[in-house]
Curated annotation (Swiss-Prot):
Pfam families: Ribosomal_S27e. Keywords: Metal-binding, Ribonucleoprotein, Ribosomal protein, Zinc, Zinc-finger. It comes from Methanosphaerula palustris (strain ATCC BAA-1556 / DSM 19958 / E1-9c). Belongs to the eukaryotic ribosomal protein eS27 family. GO terms for cellular component: ribonucleoprotein complex; ribosome. Binds 1 zinc ion per subunit. Its cofactor is Zn(2+). Part of the 30S ribosomal subunit. This is Small ribosomal subunit protein eS27.
Length: 62
């Protein structure tokens, strides 16, 4: 079967840091540790496929 268009199977998330309440956009399949740009709190850690999110998800972006 040939795909006529490429489906986007990955998402970005808008998350809120639990410490400083900064909103930040991160990739769902992050391959490195994602820190908050304001306070340095860890927002996501890599887990093979999808990242383990340590922050509140506000919205899914495609």
């Amino acid at each position: 079967m040939v795909r006529l268009y490429r489906e986007n199977r990955s998402k970005f998330y808008r998350v809120k840091c639990p410490d400083c309440e900064n909103e930040q956009i991160i990739f769902e399949k992050a391959s490195t540790v994602v820190d908050c740009v304001v306070c340095g709190h860890v927002l996501a850690e890599p887990r093979g496929g999808r990242a383990a999110l340590k922050a509140e998800i506000l919205a899914e972006l495609e």
